[in-house]
Every structure is written in structure tokens, then in C-alpha cells.
Curated annotation (Swiss-Prot):
<dbReference type="InterPro" id="IPR024962">
    <property type="entry name" value="YukD-like"/>
</dbReference>
<dbReference type="Pfam" id="PF08817">
    <property type="entry name" value="YukD"/>
</dbReference>
<comment type="function">
    <text>Required for YukE secretion. Probable component or regulator of the ESX/ESAT-6-like secretion system (BsEss).</text>
</comment>
<dbReference type="InterPro" id="IPR029071">
    <property type="entry name" value="Ubiquitin-like_domsf"/>
</dbReference>
<protein>
    <recommendedName>
        <fullName>ESX secretion system protein YukD</fullName>
    </recommendedName>
</protein>
<dbReference type="InterPro" id="IPR014921">
    <property type="entry name" value="EsaB"/>
</dbReference>
<comment type="similarity">
    <text>Belongs to the EsaB family.</text>
</comment>
């Protein structure tokens, strides 16, 4: 299923943008897509951790979005 999420890169370049993608992707792939979309020069931190701001939960890069419970409208802060 495709979901619309907001990506927050405040720890890197400060940008916030929306993505529409499959919830079958692992968190690590979502971070790779965000890096390509925003041309971020610094590499992501080890482990590819994210925080789902509106649900106050933290997940590692190995978890699939669907397994993490990430759905439409969630805001992902890349740590």
C-alpha cells in the first residue's frame, strides 16, 4: 500500500518535505530515498534510526514501515 509521510531532516540540513511511497520499504531505504531527494551531503548516522514524531516511537533501519505501524500522515524525524 502507498502512504504519504513527512520527512524531517532537522538534524542534517533542516528541510521538511513530503514523500509518497510503499509501506513495504525498510526504514533504511526510506532514508536513502530522502538523501537522494534532498541531496544531503553528510551521511546518515549508523543504524539509520528514525523517530515517528506523532506517535512518539523510535525504530531502527531494519524495520519495514508496515511492521513499524507507520501509516498515512506520519512524520518521520531522521535521527
Amino acid at each position: 500500500m502507498y502512504i504519504d509521510i513527512t520527512i524531517d531532516l532537522k538534524h542534517y540540513n533542516g528541510s521538511v518535505f513530503d514523500l509518497r511511497l510503499s509501506d513495504y520499504h525498510p526504514v533504511k531505504k526510506v532514508i536513502d530515498i530522502a538523501w537522494q531527494a534532498q541531496s544531503v551531503s553528510m551521511p546518515p548516522r549508523e543504524g539509520h534510526w528514525i523517530r515517528v514524531v506523532n506517535k512518539d516511537k523510535v525504530f531502527s533501519g531494519e524495520c519495514k514501515l508496515s511492521d513499524c505501524g507507520i501509516t498515512n500522515g506520519d512524520r518521520l524525524e531522521i535521527l
